[in-house]
Curated annotation (Swiss-Prot):
InterPro entries: Aldolase_TIM, Indole-3-glycerol_P_synth, Indole-3-glycerol_P_synth_dom, PRAI_dom, RibuloseP-bd_barrel. GO terms for biological process: L-tryptophan biosynthetic process. Keywords: Amino-acid biosynthesis, Aromatic amino acid biosynthesis, Decarboxylase, Isomerase, Lyase, Multifunctional enzyme, Tryptophan biosynthesis. It comes from Phytophthora nicotianae (Potato buckeye rot agent). Its EC number is 4.1.1.48, 5.3.1.24. The lineage of its organism: Eukaryota, Sar, Stramenopiles, Oomycota, Peronosporales. GO terms for molecular function: indole-3-glycerol-phosphate synthase activity; phosphoribosylanthranilate isomerase activity. This is Tryptophan biosynthesis protein TRP1. Pathway: Amino-acid biosynthesis; L-tryptophan biosynthesis; L-tryptophan from chorismate: step 3/5; Amino-acid biosynthesis; L-tryptophan biosynthesis; L-tryptophan from chorismate: step 4/5. Residues 1-254 are annotated as: Indole-3-glycerol phosphate synthase. Residues 255-531 are annotated as: N-(5'-phosphoribosyl)anthranilate isomerase. It holds the Pfam family PRAI.
Length: 531
């Protein structure tokens, strides 16, 4: 057990001893007489929070079957009053969500508290308890009319849970001793349950996947391995749109339009020309999906390898991952080479839904040089921003973005979009980026091309990313005209006249505009449908 867990458990023992001096077990028993429990073990989804009333209401409206409330006061700033407030919010609903007390429970007194303050279910963490303690707490939970969700993180902990006759088991994909996430933990535990001759489901062990769930693909993966529920917390809190995110997780609903099936999916956002860890984290906190690092020595935004490594490490840690994820996801999507760019974009969206990615931008380097740099730095994608062509992609070991350079709208009467399309070859670059070309510059030009070309690419089932002259003020229009998979910004979020120096207010405004675009577009379509 890690020191932090030992410290928390020790503190909770002190907390319980103090609470017993203030509120007796008899007082709690009287309070329990006035509360009812409705919990049953078949739940499709769980969600968790420290419970402001508006969040509880939002989760309930989104279809949560259970709302998990943190009640540990010192480290997680929770309280029993938070849980009672959550119960009061959902009370009276015809199919109200169950309330789960999420805490470090080590004493039967805490179960009495849970029942008295409105809980239907409690979390029991195996790594905190002996088998004898677990048996005692499970029995006491059931005697109080509640259900015990028993959390395990390994096959060894599973055996302890099964010996205690636990039948509702949550597999935490996060190891509480190291805080590392392993998304295969649930599958390993599910296999172990079957190997022990037990079934998964209503008549056997009800299995829940906890932690790290960020996409519909994750949900499908756990459903296939036998899980009957999921717990989603931080990902929902960061999403900004609980209802839409829950629907996406559970149903994978997409909307289509005449401009192509990607048009009304959330646009991805890449912030490029990042030169410091501070800038990267600011972009990530505001919702950036990709962080771009310039590896071209002639660029004013060039980053030395040591700083690039620090930025890449910070991005991985922010996304709670230790290595690349896109390559593995691409393998599952590219078993069939047909509809090449469509399949690649699906994989990119899935990867970005799990964690932000790091892109290294190169100009006229050899495949050997780019492979070596990508491995040393820890890149997820290699962006080709020079005159490399497409064939070089065969020799690059990482997913690639190929930039196509288009003229500035002010410098030409028009562009032959069909001729541009002819430059693209399937089966080579994974993604296409449309950017503006300016003599003497490759990227970061601050000028725009004709955004209608991006729309032509989308209609031709060549979904692309779009860069060139994008700013917080014009990105919504660019998205509305071009319908790209995502947008790429660099100079548009910088301090004027200072390449590589990000204006964090502009970064936040740009990313907010990208996020808000989808809500505006969806509202417009809904209004048109009603009319």
């Amino acid at each position: 057990m890690g020191n932090i867990l030992e410290e928390i458990a020790a503190q909770r023992r002190l907390d319980v001893a103090a609470a017993k001096q203030v509120v007796s077990t008899d007082d709690l028993a009287k309070k329990i007489e006035h509360t009812e429990s409705v919990y049953g073990p078949a739940l499709p989804v769980l969600e968790r929070l420290n419970a402001p009333a508006e969040q509880v209401q939002a989760y309930a409206n989104a279809g949560a079957s259970m709302i998990s409330v943190l009640t540990e006061p010192k480290w997680f700033k929770g309280s029993l009053d938070d849980m009672m407030e959550a119960r009061e919010v959902v009370e009276g609903m015809s199919q109200r969500p169950a309330i789960l007390r999420k805490d470090f429970i080590i004493d039967v007194y805490q179960l009495l508290e849970a029942r008295a303050y409105g809980a239907d279910c409690v979390l029991l963490i195996v790594t905190l308890l002996s088998k004898e303690q677990l048996i005692e707490l499970i029995d006491a939970t059931h005697n109080l009319g509640m259900c015990a969700l028993v959390e395990v993180n390994s096959v060894q902990e599973l055996d302890i849970a099964l010996a205690a006759k636990a039948r509702l088991i949550g597999v935490n994909n996060r190891d509480l001793r190291t805080f590392k996430v392993d998304m295969n933990t649930t599958a390993r535990v599910a296999d172990a349950i079957r190997e022990r001759g037990l079934s998964l489901g209503r008549d056997g062990v009800a299995l829940f996947a906890l932690s790290g769930i960020r996409s519909h693909t994750d949900v499908v993966k756990y459903e296939k391995c036998g899980a009957r529920g999921i717990l989603v917390g931080e990902y929902l809190m960061k999403s900004g749109d609980i209802a839409t995110t829950v629907k996406d997780l559970l149903q994978n609903v997409t909307r289509h339009s005449e401009s192509g099936e990607f048009a009304l999916l959330p646009p991805l956002a890449k912030v490029c020309g990042i030169t410091t860890v501070e800038y990267a984290l600011a972009a990530l906190r505001n919702g950036a999906n990709m962080i771009g690092i310039i590896m071209a020595e002639h660029s004013p935004r060039y980053v030395e390898k040591e700083e690039a490594k620090a930025i890449a490490k910070a991005v991985r840690e922010y996304g709670e991952r230790t290595g690349p994820i896109l390559s593995d996801i691409l393998e599952s999507h590219l078993d069939d080479k047909s509809d090449w760019f469509h399949r690649n974009v699906l994989a990119l969206r899935e990867a970005c839904s799990r964690a932000p990615l790091v892109v290294g931008v190169f100009v006229n380097k050899t495949a050997t040089e780019m492979n070596a740099a990508a491995e040393e730095i820890g890149l997820d994608l290699v962006q080709l921003h020079g005159d490399e062509g497409f064939e070089i992609c065969k020799d690059i070991k990482y997913p690639t973005i190929r930039a196509l350079h288009l003229p500035d709208t002010a410098q030409c009467d028009g562009v032959d979009a069909e001729a541009v399309l002819q430059q693209v070859s399937e089966g080579l670059a994974n993604y296409i980026l449309l950017d503006t070309t300016v003599k003497g510059q490759q990227g970061g030009t601050g000028v725009a091309f004709d955004w209608k070309i991006a729309a032509i690419f989308t209609q031709a089932r060549l979904p692309c990313l779009m860069a060139g002259g994008l700013t917080p003020e014009n990105v919504v229009k660019a998205l509305s005209v071009g319908h790209p998979v995502g947008v790429d910004v660099s100079s548009g979020v910088e301090v004027k006249g200072s390449p590589g120096v990000k204006d964090l207010d502009k970064v936040a405004a740009f990313l907010k505009a990208v996020k808000d675009h989808l809500s505006v577009a969806t509202l417009k379509i809904d209004e048109e449908t009603e009319n």
